[in-house]
Amino acid sequence: MNRGDSIMLLDLSNVLSEQHKSVDKNVSISMDEFRLRGKTYPVLSKDELHIQVEYAGDQKLRVSGLTNLTIGIPCDRCLEEVPVDFKLDFTREVETKEAGVASDEADQLDENNYIDGYHLDVEKLLYNEILVGWPMKVLCSEDCKGICSVCGQNLNEGTCSCEDTGLDPRMSVIRDVFKNFKEV
């Protein structure tokens, strides 16, 4: 999903009217891929999003959601695709834009970019929630050996015939210290 093109809009006119009716729906997720920093990650599985929107007073909305997604993210060592589960269970309180004027704080943080007038953009909301839960490091297993820096062979699947270049020559002093330590 590009942050600019989004399809799923939820009508908030009943919530923002004087009656302040709440919205409680199950919404199908149309997101088939997740784009981040120029890379595309496939959405492997997705449940419906259960979303609730209610008026929280003082021109604020309380947005709650619950869903599960699985996204294929490459292992940081061997580049094999790893299914990563995102269990999204969130509640956000956001300010509404009164007469088209947003608060300066909300503009700076861009924390409610998924509410535009009387519509809530479900795809942008999901994008933001996935982004918050995005893992810092993804490994296929704790003992992943990665890939050969010379030929690119996945070392989990077998060894390669490249010569072991050993340590960086600048690290030879440290290697010698460890050799001397082992001899003692």
Tell me what each language-model feature is.
Residues 1-184:
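Structured interface patches
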